[in-house]
């Protein structure tokens, strides 16, 4: 549903004029600040807008100009592209929309028809972070690994190419393509499922492959693709990493640097996460958790910097990178800025990768510091979890994830969504008992014990650091905070800064807020009634400045489920996970209706077939295969169906859903390749038992602290 205000007269552009973004236009984006031409607005990806019509003096008058219901309750993570009064963006399942930026009127819609069963292959939801627009085409990468070029005027497909090298492996794509020099660049995800990462460049005109760069070495018995892979293989020792994939996927940040004609890749975690399994002889495991610079035209290696040598915690370096010119220690430098998962904020010289700064921006316990001489972190040996479980900060969601930051070069600050979100790491039981790790081709491959995760958490609950989120103004050179806003939930949205003196941010509580960039004071706030992950953008159309944001949570936090301890104000749990595009302007007067509270009642459970041994077995299988979407202890986080609320009809066909995949067309694929009907029965009994416990609590028949969470 689109609800505009009184619609201005629109001068429709001719089809030949739509989407005509080229390299020069992006390089000179500052000359047309009303457009948002690229993923991070410019090639530098600072996500800081020079627009000032909306500013500190009048932001209190901001209101909804129009909105569009997107018809999904899955997470929305897209950064829209706005050019010449047309907005291009994506939603779940890689669907693409082109709408009028003034009214929200839909111009065209494209559905790549991703098989819904492919959702099982995605570690972290069926999300998509956006498109690239270039020379009259719109480029989108689909969840199932296709790169598709669309006519920007009509949405018709121009060409399509399969980017996946091995379709027996669980590759996915959720990231936005980047464009430069007549090429489209795209990576992929899937490290948890045992894949080998790479980035490919395609000809933007016809989709022909130009070059491909692998981020980790393959089988050393085979010829290496280039000298860098031969060099990297020497840093993997004692294991058969190529059989479990190795990881190193580039699932988010790819940045083009016109100053050096370089392409920077943000490389992900190892597969499995645990290095003692992946590379038992030690080694840095290049290029995991690294920033890699390539020649943008040829894909030739230039330099790299590894943020977390021998990654052991899922500390990706795929988080957004920004480029800037800054004075560092009295010298003008062209720098790259990144706040990856590991909790240190890196400032690198873009010419050669020299480390200039590495200051912690959140609570970090895995390392004491980064040695600026060696460039390496100083690990904390007391948190080695090879023998015993250890709480570590950050956990695998990181001190900062993919949610965008904003770089204010003039102020020397970064407006950063950060988090303290720990995990207790413990080696998988089978490896501890036998010293042998068996890859699971149909599930996650972390090397950690997830089957018993609830019991492990409860056994160590008193030692758990408190999870929380932050929005902060951070000085990357000094490591100091200018100001900090604490947010009760850790999983919040991206950030936009503007020359109007404002910082915009959406959070898990459903609040879209404008802060004073000088001191963090709240100047304006709007309740969207839906938790947010996506970054805001701002643009100008017909002389009017707008601010927009997509609503809807999910993504990598699906496994955490309902927050523990509870966060009463969590919007998508309180109301619904309503996917919307909201667009604001000064004087906007469209009103959103206040939604009803979500029905969270749990039906009575049939416990006649339930027994403790079946429940205990079911818990292990649930945590291995179901919990990553449906939530820890069967408590959904709001984006995926809450299994405690299944009705009698769904209970009747439970095994047909889980084994046969009768809901495959809805995104719930079958698991016959990894589960037996008997094991599905056990999962069913665990779900019933957990539902019954929480129902008794909700009826006041049991104190919350007495609810049984585990049967291990």
Where are these regions (language model features)?
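Short, conserved, GDST-rich strand-edge loop motifs in beta-rich repeat architectures
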Residues: 186-198, 238, 265-285, 420-464, ...
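Gly/Gly-Pro-rich "capping" loops immediately C-terminal to redox-active cysteine motifs
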Residues: 619, 631-664, 669-671
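His/Cys-centered metal/cofactor-coordination and adjacent catalytic loops
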Residues: 592-614, 627-646
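Blade-level signature of beta-propeller repeat domains, shared across WD40, Kelch, NHL, RCC1
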Residues: 537-599
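Extracytoplasmic beta-rich repeat domains
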Residues: 68-79, 109-132, 160-176, 214-253, ...
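Blade/loop signatures of beta-propeller domains
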Residues: 7-64, 220-229, 376-380, 459-461, ...
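Repeat-blade elements of multi-bladed beta-propeller folds
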Residues: 36-40, 73-95, 120-146, 172-193, ...
């Amino acid at each position: 549903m689109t609800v505009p205000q009184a619609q201005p007269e629109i001068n429709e552009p001719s089809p030949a004029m739509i989407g005509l973004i080229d390299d020069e236009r992006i390089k000179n984006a500052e000359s047309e600040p009303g457009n948002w031409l690229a993923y991070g607005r410019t090639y530098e990806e600072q996500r800081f807008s020079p627009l000032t019509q909306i500013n500190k003096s009048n932001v209190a008058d901001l209101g909804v100009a129009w909105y569009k219901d997107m018809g999904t309750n899955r997470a929305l993570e897209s950064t829209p592209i706005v050019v010449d009064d047309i907005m291009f963006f994506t939603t779940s399942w890689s669907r693409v929309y082109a709408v009028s930026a003034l009214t929200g009127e839909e111009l065209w819609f494209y559905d790549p028809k991703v098989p819904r069963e492919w959702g099982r292959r995605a570690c972290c939801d069926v999300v998509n972070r956006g498109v690239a627009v270039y020379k009259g085409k719109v480029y989108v990468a689909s969840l199932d690994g296709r790169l598709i070029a669309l006519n920007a005027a009509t949405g018709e497909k121009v060409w399509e190419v399969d980017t996946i090298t091995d379709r027996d492996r669980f590759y996915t794509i959720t990231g936005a393509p980047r464009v430069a020099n007549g090429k489209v660049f795209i990576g992929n995800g899937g490290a948890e499922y045992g894949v080998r990462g790479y980035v490919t460049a395609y000809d933007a005109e016809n989709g022909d492959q130009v070059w491909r760069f692998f981020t980790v070495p393959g089988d050393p018995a085979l010829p290496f693709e280039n000298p860098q892979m031969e060099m990297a293989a020497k840093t993997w020792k004692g294991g058969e990493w190529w059989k479990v994939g190795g990881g190193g996927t580039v699932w988010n940040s790819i940045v083009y640097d016109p100053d050096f004609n370089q392409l920077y890749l943000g490389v992900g975690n190892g597969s499995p996460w645990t290095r003692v399994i992946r590379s038992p002889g030690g080694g840095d495991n290049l290029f995991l958790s690294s920033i890699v610079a390539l020649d943008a035209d040829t894909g030739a290696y230039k330099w790299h910097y590894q943020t977390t040598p021998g990654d052991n915690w899922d500390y990706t370096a795929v988080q957004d990178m920004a480029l800037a010119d800054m004075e560092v220690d009295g010298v003008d430098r062209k720098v790259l800025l990144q706040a990856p998962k590991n909790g240190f904020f890196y400032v690198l010289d873009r010419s050669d990768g020299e480390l200039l700064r590495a200051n912690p921006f959140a609570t970090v316990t895995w390392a004491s510091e980064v040695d600026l001489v060696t460039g390496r972190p100083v690990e904390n040996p007391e948190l080695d979890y090879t023998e015993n479980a250890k709480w570590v900060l950050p956990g695998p969601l990181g001190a900062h994830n993919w949610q965008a930051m904003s770089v204010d070069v003039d102020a020397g600050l970064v407006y950063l969504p950060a988090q303290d979100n720990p995990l207790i790491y413990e080696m998988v039981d089978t490896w501890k008992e036998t010293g042998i790790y068996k890859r699971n081709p149909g599930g996650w491959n972390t090397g950690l014990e997830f089957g018993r995760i609830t019991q492990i958490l409860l056994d160590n609950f008193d030692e758990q650091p408190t999870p929380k989120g932050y929005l902060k103004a951070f000085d990357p050179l000094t490591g100091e905070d200018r100001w900090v806003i604490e947010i009760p939930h850790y999983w919040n949205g991206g950030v936009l800064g503007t020359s109007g003196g404002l910082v915009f941010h959406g959070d898990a509580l459903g609040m879209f807020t404008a802060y004073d960039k000088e001191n963090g004071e709240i100047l304006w706030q709007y309740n969207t009634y839906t938790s947010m992950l996506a970054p805001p953008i701002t643009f100008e159309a017909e002389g009017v400045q707008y601010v927009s944001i997509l609503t809807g949570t999910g993504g990598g936090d699906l496994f955490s489920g309902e927050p523990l301890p509870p966060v009463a104000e969590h919007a998508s749990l309180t109301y619904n996970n309503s996917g919307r595009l909201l667009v604001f302007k000064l004087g906007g007067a469209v009103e959103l209706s206040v939604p009803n509270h979500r029905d969270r009642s749990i039906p009575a459970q049939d416990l006649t077939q339930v027994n403790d041994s079946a429940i205990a077995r079911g818990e292990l299988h649930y945590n291995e295969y179901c919990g990553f979407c449906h939530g820890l202890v069967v408590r959904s986080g709001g984006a995926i169906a809450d299994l405690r609320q299944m009705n009698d009809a769904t209970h009747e066909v439970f095994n047909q859903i889980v084994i046969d995949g009768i809901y495959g067309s809805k995104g719930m694929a079958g698991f016959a390749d990894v589960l037996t009907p008997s094991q599905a029965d056990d999962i069913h009994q665990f779900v019933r038992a957990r539902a019954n416990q929480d129902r008794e609590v909700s009826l006041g028949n049991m104190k919350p602290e007495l609810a049984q969470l585990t049967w291990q």
